[in-house]
Amino acid sequence: MRLRHLILPLLAAPLLTACVNDGATYEIDNTREHVLSLIREQPLFWDSKVDLFLVVSRMPSCMRRHSLGTGSPVSKVEVYQVPSGAFIIKVGKRMFVTETQTCEGFAKLSEEPAEGMGELKGTFQVKKGELVFVKEESGEASATQ
């Protein structure tokens, strides 16, 4: 009887480790107070999709979590900044706009803005099995977390 209680958790452990629950952060002003963070959640190990969330934060003033829908575990998420200071988030063909003044502004875009996407700041992507933010730096990128 005691052996059964030990074997059951050991059999369940590999199933739980297959789930994705991680995140990476883009530090806007090179500070931890003003950031965009991407969170990936895969609550069911057999599901091939992950739920994507964007956390917009300018501490201590505001912080909000917005849903970006679903994606694959290796989906790339691009971050652009327009001259007004707003950010355009691109997940595949889907685009969203958000801001960090109140952290409340968030909307899905049906098409690329007429004035353009703005400056590419970097991309959230999986490298060596880990979600990282790869900052766009004058033609060459460097991985940061």
Where do the protein language model's features map onto the residues?
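Sec-dependent bacterial lipoprotein signal peptides
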Residues: 1-19
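Hydrophobic transmembrane signal anchors and adjacent membrane-proximal interface regions, especially
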Residues: 2, 26, 64, 122-124, ...
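N-terminal export/targeting and maturation segments
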Residues: 14, 18-69
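Repeated scaffold domains used in trafficking and secretory/extracellular systems
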Residues: 21-27, 70-82, 116-123
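Broad, structure-driven detector of short, well-ordered beta-strand segments within folded domains
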Residues: 34-38, 79, 124
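Mature extracytoplasmic domains of secretory-pathway proteins
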Residues: 46-104
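Acidic, small-residue rich beta-repeat scaffolds with periodic aromatic anchors
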Residues: 82-145
